[in-house]
């Protein structure tokens, strides 16, 4: 089923067909962190973030993680233990901004960063950096379709039952993530925000992942999934 959020078409899917064959990467990697946290996250361009929050929060039941207004309007949503699986960016445009895949090993991210620079002169969209809200260390790559792919590691796991939505004002990154595709004046806004954050001594915690919390979220998800399947069988 497809619906629209005042511009972007959203497809709702239940129990998609999955391939039993294991994924084989084009280069040696340690694998991706998916499982109960899903693929990673997706971010959409929108003209007005505030107008669309009720659609995702109240109709689709996404939970707000955090939001910010400077240097650009952003709102992040979670649907499981991953800090955010979806986000809106108030760029005034429509369409796909980027999706993120999370690697199990930081070296996979670093090696991919090197390979992309060696093989594609202008392949990097955002330089290597670390985000302030989900603590993801990542870089963004250009695609032929015009959107970006974020290649990340070390994303934050939260407890959805205890999480409180809040505004963030540190800017999107602790360091790095220089937006090479933007004009100099636009890049300067983000650079100033990073410098302010550094001067305040803001940084991510030393421990960014908790195996115990991850396993408990996984267990809760599996119980909920079984219950949903039983409820569906009762309806049918």
Q: How would you describe each model-predicted region?
A:
Residues 15-50, 63, 94-101, 198-207, ...:
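N-terminal beta-strand motif that seeds the catalytic metal site of vicinal oxygen chelate
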């Amino acid at each position: 089923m497809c619906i629209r959020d005042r511009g972007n078409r959203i497809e709702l899917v239940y129990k998609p067909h999955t391939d039993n064959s294991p994924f084989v990467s084009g280069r040696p990697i340690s694998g991706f962190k998916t499982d109960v946290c899903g693929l990673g996250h997706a971010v959409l361009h929108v003209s007005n973030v505030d107008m669309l929050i009720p659609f995702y929060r109240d109709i689709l039941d996404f939970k707000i993680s955090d939001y910010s207004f400077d240097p650009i309007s952003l709102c992040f949503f979670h649907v499981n233990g991953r800090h955010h699986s979806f986000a809106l960016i108030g760029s005034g445009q429509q369409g796909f901004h980027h999706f993120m895949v999370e690697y199990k090993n930081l070296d996979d991210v670093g090696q991919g960063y090197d390979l992309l620079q060696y093989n594609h002169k202008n392949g990097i969209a955002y330089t290597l950096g670390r985000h302030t809200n989900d603590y993801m260390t990542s870089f963004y790559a250009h695609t032929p379709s015009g959107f970006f792919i974020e290649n990340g590691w070390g994303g934050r796991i939260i407890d959805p039952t205890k999480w409180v939505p809040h505004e963030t004002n540190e800017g999107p990154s602790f360091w790095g993530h220089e937006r090479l595709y933007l004009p100099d004046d636009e890049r300067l806004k983000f650079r100033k925000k990073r410098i302010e954050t550094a001067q305040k001594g803001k940084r991510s915690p030393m421990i960014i992942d908790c195996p115990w919390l991850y396993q408990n979220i996984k267990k809760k998800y599996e119980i909920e999934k079984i219950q949903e399947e039983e409820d569906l069988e009762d309806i049918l």
